[in-house]
From Swiss-Prot:
Residues 1-30 have a biased composition (Low complexity). This is Translation factor GUF1 homolog, chloroplastic. GO terms for cellular component: chloroplast. This protein may be expected to contain an N-terminal transit peptide but none has been predicted. It catalyses: GTP + H2O = GDP + phosphate + H(+). Residues 87-283 form the tr-type G domain. Residues 1-41 are annotated as: Disordered. It is an enzyme of class 3 (hydrolase). Promotes chloroplast protein synthesis. May act as a fidelity factor of the translation reaction, by catalyzing a one-codon backward translocation of tRNAs on improperly translocated ribosomes. GO terms for biological process: positive regulation of translation; translation.
Length: 702
């Protein structure tokens, strides 16, 4: 019995092994279920592929098996920092009107070249600010270096320099374009040429860039992609796409244009190949003295200012002593590198390359956009052309709703100015608003962005006064004073003349709305220049118009009259003499400085009447009568009043002697008289923005 048990156990093991053999085979290699003779599904091992057999034989010790390494296709690591000659470098930017797909195209190019891993991709990758993502615009430019293997087998370095598209940042755009040799002009296939398209193309042409036209969003229903023909763009209806607009308005040849959809990944290979073939490489000037163009800078709270630049001549590396030719500041480079778009440190950068530099710089005001970097030893004698300091065009007052937050507002503005050299501010005091700051901005969008960042990032409650522009006031003794605050305008007795800034305005709109838009421009004292028909259904209107008429509600009125289809672009032209006056507002006989404005004399009554009527609606009633007046100097041109609320002091008198009622009424009248003398009127925030909402349709000036 003792020997039978092991035998039975051995038989059991053999039986179990036989039963589990198919599963063991499946564990060693692929298998599948098959039906046996009894109709049951059983797992049956199948022959393993060659690589599996080879691995199994190798592990079993079979000496006759030769393991051959897998032959992989030669690839270029997209994350490698390639050292290539200038002939294999392409520097380009993307220019487009808002919402034509510029950020989406940049994202797709980064993904197509595997610069950014799929797991790290996100929409608007180069737009790092929350405001940029929410509004769908580019405010702060960025750059990215891509490695691309072209059809000719060569590996190229493509430096994408992303640019803001709004006119407020036109100087930054011009310096970014100066760092490139080419640009992608992105036009929405269903909307055609828009205002910012024209403005940015002119900047590109001024910098002598090679322009590649990209007709984007061909996957939209309005673009009719089913009519696409190979290597042709003329499948679009001219009135829908704007191919004729590109040729007629911009003067660009569309024969080599690329039809694409950045969202659907259509035409990306053609775009990359055109970048390599059409955009010229940077010149090989590595042996000349260093000259590098600063086209962006931002403040890092831990590293100081990070300078983004393009090496034009020479080369630079870690430890080099450099200086900025326009500011005269000198620094030693602590770190240098490239953007992918995250920072990747390297040892040196040569002519034609784009990168960043950290050198213990404390403020972006010391590293201004457009400045030239050179070495302190063997430095260049000629800076790169085109440098100028950003000049604010629009001013407004910022006051904290809580007077205790004045110091917080000052600190917040100082922090923003570290990262925004174009922002200007100085303390201001108002009898109605208390202490605040008079701030200067590049334009309305710049003003809105700064205000929103102050409220969002620093949790401040702000009251913003109506925006104004910079006027040149010539006094009787020949002196010229720049005035941004209407309250600072000298008295008429000492003024000789006032000049206001005029801008060149271009409006693009469907032809159905031309009449209404011309009426709007004439009401705002615009001078007609030209009208161009882009196609049968689209028109371009050109006007010379005062900037002060544009910075208020002109854009809102433009969109309202065109049902949202019109777009506009403006650029500074010149200062011109105008018959301007200061319109003061008095509330309860006290001047409200934040409500003062400068307007044309012919429109002063319309402005004054509209303003006092609007304030009457917005200022809450008090226990005393509130007079509201609009005046020019000492002359009141419009007035109204808010009637007092009356408390029913006779409610407790149920009949009785009339003398008791007269006594109560007399006491109430005396109290209201005293309240009117010493009472304060609180003006809500909406009242200060009422200046923007005054109907200016009546009256015009020249």
């Amino acid at each position: 019995m003792a020997s039978a048990a092991p035998a039975s156990r051995g038989a059991a093991r053999a039986s179990t092994a036989a039963r589990d053999a198919p599963f063991a085979a499946a564990a060693r290699g692929p298998g599948r279920f098959r039906r046996d003779g009894n109709g049951r599904n059983r797992l049956v091992a199948v022959r393993a592929p060659r690589r599996w057999t080879t691995r199994a034989a190798a592990t079993s010790g079979d000496a006759n098996v030769v393991i051959k390494p897998k032959k992989e296709r030669a690839k270029v690591d997209p994350n490698a920092v390639l050292q290539v000659p200038p002939s294999q470098i392409r520097n380009f930017s993307i220019i487009a009107h808002i919402d034509h797909g510029k950020s989406t195209l940049a994202d797709t190019l980064l993904s197509k070249t595997k610069t950014v891993a799929a797991r790290d991709m996100e929409a608007q990758l180069l737009d790092s600010m929350d405001i940029e993502r929410e509004r769908g615009i580019t405010i702060k430019l960025n750059s990215a270096r891509m490695n691309y293997v072209a059809n000719d087998g060569e590996t190229y370095v493509l430096n994408l320099i992303d640019t803001p598209g709004h006119v407020d940042f036109s100087y930054e755009v011009s310096r970014s374009l100066a760092a490139c040799e080419g640009a992608l002009l992105v036009v929405d296939a269903s909307q055609g040429v828009e205002a910012q398209t024209v403005a940015n193309v002119y900047l590109a042409l001024e910098n002598d860039l090679e322009i590649i036209t990209v007709l984007n969003k061909i996957d939209l229903p309005g673009a009719e992609p089913e009519r696409v023909k190979v290597r042709s763009i003329h499948w679009f209806p001219y009135d829908r796409v704007g191919v004729r607009e590109i040729e007629d308005v911009l003067g660009l040849d569309t024969e080599d244009a690329v039809v694409a959809s950045a969202k659907a990944n259509i035409g990306m290979e053609d775009i990359l190949e055109n970048i390599v073939k059409m955009i010229p490489p940077p010149p090989d000037t590595g042996d000349e003295p260093l000259r590098a163009l600063i086209f962006d800078s931002y403040f890092d709270p831990y590293r100081g200012v990070v300078v983004i630049f393009r090496v034009v001549d020479g080369n630079l590396g870690v430890g080099d002593a450099v200086k900025f030719m326009n500011t005269g500041k000198s620094y030693t480079i602590d770190e240098i590198g490239i953007m992918r778009p995250q920072k990747v440190p390297v040892n040196r950068l040569s002519a034609g390359e784009v990168g960043y530099m950290i050198a213990n710089i404390k403020s972006v005001a010391d590293a201004r956009v457009g400045d030239t970097i050179t070495t302190t030893k063997d430095s260049s004698t000629e800076p790169l052309p085109g440098y100028s300091e950003a000049t604010p065009m629009v001013y407004c007052g910022l006051f904290p709703t809580d007077s205790d937050q004045y110091e917080d507002l000052r600190v917040a503005l100082g922090k923003l100015q570290i990262n925004d050299a174009a922002l200007r501010y100085e303390p201001e005091q108002s009898s109605a608003m208390g202490f605040g700051f008079r701030c200067g901005f590049l334009g309305l969008l710049h003003m809105e962005i700064v205000q929103e960042r102050l409220e969002r990032e620093y949790d401040l409650g702000l009251i913003t006064t109506a925006p104004s522009v910079v006027y040149k006031v010539y006094t009787s003794d020949g002196a010229c004073v720049d005035i941004a605050n209407p309250a600072d305008l000298p008295d008429a007795s000492v003024r000789d003349r006032i000049e206001e800034p005029f801008v060149k305005l271009e409006m693009f709109a469907p032809s159905d709305y031309v009449g209404s838009l011309m009426e709007l421009a004439q009401q705002r004292r615009g001078e007609f220049i030209d009208m161009t028909y882009l196609s049968e259904s689209r028109t371009c209107l050109k006007y010379d118009i005062p900037l002060g008429e544009v910075v208020t509600d002109f854009f809102d009125e433009l969109k309202s009259r065109s049902k949202g289809y019109a777009s506009m672009e403006y650029s500074f032209n010149e200062y011109r003499k105008s018959d301007l006056v200061r319109l003061d507002v008095l509330i309860n006989y006290e001047p409200a400085d934040p409500l003062a404005c400068i307007c044309h004399r012919d429109k002063s009554y319309v402005m004054g009447r509209g303003l006092v009527d609007k304030l009457k609606e917005l200022i809450p009633r008090q226990m005393f009568r509130i007079p509201i007046q609009a005046s020019i100097g000492t002359k009141v041109i419009a007035s109204t009043s808010i009637s007092a609320m009356r408390k029913d002091v006779l409610a407790k008198c149920y009949g009785g002697d009339i003398s008791r009622k007269k006594k109560l009424l007399k006491k109430q009248a005396a109290g209201k008289k005293r309240m009117k003398q010493f009472g304060k009127v609180e003006v809500p925030q909406e009242a200060f923005m009422a200046v923007l909402k005054v109907d200016q349709n009546a009256g015009s000036g020249g």
